[in-house]
């Protein structure tokens, strides 16, 4: 079962909390317990993180289902976290931790607001949300605020 098949609260939990467990595991175990290995493989993992950022963003642009757009955008943001962690300096790790916190809040809000929009419009397709601001101005504003927060 893919994340787009799950209900909005489950998807929000998976993306908002559980995806960060892997990044926390990298920080706690790979970097702190195995610093020599982290230094040795840091350039490779930074390159993989950059590939994830670019590739997932391109895939997100090609989607028409908003849940897929948000999911691929989430993968891209986790690539930013990986790059920050494997810079192996205080600024990069602090930035990665801040990105994890911000991403968890924003992505959960995006999935919840998308769930409410999809419930009211009957679709998750991007084209089906036209005119949502006219019929549901507060919900559209909330969704737009989370979307803008996700952009940066």
Predicted features and spans:
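Hydrophobic transmembrane alpha-helices and their helix-loop junctions in integral membrane proteins
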Residues: 4-152
